[in-house]
Amino acid sequence: MAQDVCPTRSEPSLSFLQGLILGQLSVVLLIAAFIKFFIFGEAPSAEETASIRATERRSRTLAHKKSLLSLRSAATQRQGSQPPALPALNKKKSSILRSNPPTLTIGSILDKTYYKVDSHQPESLDWFNVLIAQTIAQFRSDAQHDDAILTSLSKTLNGTSRPDFVDEIRVSELSLGEDFPIFSNCRIIPVDEDGLQFGAGKAFDPKQAAREGARLQARMDVDLSDMITLAVETKLLLNFPKRLSAVLPVALAVSVVRFSGTLSISFNPSNPSENTPTKMTFTFLDDYRLDFSIRSLLGSRSRLQDVPKIAQLVESRLHRWFDERCVEPRFQEIELPSMWPRKKNTRGGDEIIANIEQSINKAHGGAIAKEARQELDTETDGLRYRRRPVGDDTYSVSGSMPGSLPGIDMPT
């Protein structure tokens, strides 16, 4: 009898309503934690961030140099195991020029210019700073009177890479700064074809720099403390659940407040056999420091101002953009024009005198034309006042005509 009784079913400890409330609270807590720690979390200090980035760049540079050295050693072993190549046929050269000119190596260039790599003191580059300052000042002056840079920025920001959910980007502020970069501590360093210094930490050996691809590299410190600002405004088009259901205004201002680093410049001479022109390459070493000041504003009514996470994302993106273009081992290469003197590039001398005479003749001709116009206007005014009257009084004469008989009036 006791076995036929159904066991009582245990009721759940939490009702459906309690579970729903608990789930909603957990979602709210997760959203609050995300907003507090991810969006409004305090950003690390600038010194800490710069130290972390410098360590990452240094490790990347060391790994690149290590891979270059390993590839170079493997290539040397491979060349040693191969039989010697047959001598190439010499092309016929002009007999007018000297047949065997002395080969200019890095060692001979340094000797003839009296530059001792191991003992020469770094140069201050004051004259170079003045030239660069004049160039930048002229560029800023041209930008104030011309909208070319603003038009170019607008086209670049609104190019094909702009996402669909981002509205048209408008430049709201552009400041090119007021100060100038200061270059100093310039020194000449011989490097190999891969940009590695010969015998780093050791005395310079001219025999090592005699191989093909070696070149001289100028390294100089550069420091800039300024406020170069670019501010943009746009809207985020939130197309969910339907198109243009919500719009979020966004304003962002990025300012470069300081840059310091080491600039490396070198020349790659032309190769007539391969028809390659002379090129100048420049890059920055991995010990640079680049500081930004980033301001942000989200929303139209309930505005979120200066969100730290947005500043971190933008700054990280800008550092990555700079590293991928002109920080070693990457470099920028600029093709240089021919330095041979040409008639079409000649300025000064008789040409300046001819231009001055032409401008004087134009000014003199303009003055003569102005005087002629004034004389013509004066004659026109005189003719206007000597015009005969019109109407009934055309031939009326008051009194007697000279030479007429007294008492006889002329008929009218």
Swiss-Prot record:
Pfam families: MMM1. CDD domains: SMP_Mmm1. It is found in: Endoplasmic reticulum membrane. It is a single-pass type I membrane protein. Residues 121-337 form the SMP-LTD domain. One of its GO terms (cellular component) is ERMES complex. The chain crosses the membrane at residues 20-40. Residues 372-384 have a biased composition (Basic and acidic residues). Belongs to the MMM1 family. Homodimer. Component of the ER-mitochondria encounter structure (ERMES) or MDM complex, composed of MMM1, MDM10, MDM12 and MDM34. A MMM1 homodimer associates with one molecule of MDM12 on each side in a pairwise head-to-tail manner, and the SMP-LTD domains of MMM1 and MDM12 generate a continuous hydrophobic tunnel for phospholipid trafficking. This is Maintenance of mitochondrial morphology protein 1. The gene is MMM1.
